[in-house]
UniProtKB/Swiss-Prot annotation:
The chain crosses the membrane at residues 7-27. Its main location: membrane. Strongly expressed in embryonic and larval somatic muscles and postembryonic heart. This is Sarcolamban B. Keywords: Membrane, Sarcoplasmic reticulum, Transmembrane, Transmembrane helix. It is found in: Sarcoplasmic reticulum membrane. Interacts with SERCA. Plays an essential role in the regulation of calcium transport at the sarcoplasmic reticulum (SR), which is secondarily required for regular muscle contraction. GO terms for biological process: regulation of cardiac muscle contraction. Disruption phenotype: SclA and SclB double mutants show arrhythmic cardiac contractions and correspondingly, cardiac cells show irregular action potentials (APs), involving 'double' and occasionally failed APs. Calcium transients in these mutants show higher amplitudes and steeper decay than those in wild type flies.
Amino acid sequence: MNEAKSLFTTFLILAFLLFLLYAFYEAAF
């Protein structure tokens, strides 16, 4: 269960970074 939670946390961080990258791209262009 701990491993699954860690995987979920990693996915959440990746999604957040992807969102920040998209927001920055929209703001720049």
